[in-house]
Amino acid sequence: MKVLMINGSSNNKGCTAQALEIVAGVFKEEGIDSEIIHLGAEAYHDCTGCGLCRTKLNGKCVYDDVVNVLIEKAKSSDGFIFSSPVYYAHPSGRLLSVLDRAFFAGGKYFAHKRGSSVVSARRAGTTASLDVINKYFMINQMP
């Protein structure tokens, strides 16, 4: 079994990354392979709805960045954990931009696979943030 984890924070060594490292340690103890992709401080395009991913690019996004890497790795992954710090009661914009594009272009590679979410916050907003991330799982039939 392989689990792909996405750190939606701009800080590759922050609280969200630390939470994923703890999860990765538990997976290792249980014999489960895992990989963490850190989105980092790079800026990501939002989905423009051009549709080229479905009509001409065979499930790849027109913007050649980490989204296409994520889609490719999703093909061989059995489960996913999407994580984000909480900003104003919401997941990071970078995570949402990446997930919007990955699920639109390569949704079939996520469908019917396990999904979970992790958020980190100093104060409030965790429930709302988890709700936003978990909707990707519900919409894409991920138990």
How does the language model describe each region?
Residues 1-105:
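N-terminal beta1-alpha1-beta2 submodule of the flavodoxin-like/Rossmannoid cofactor-binding fold
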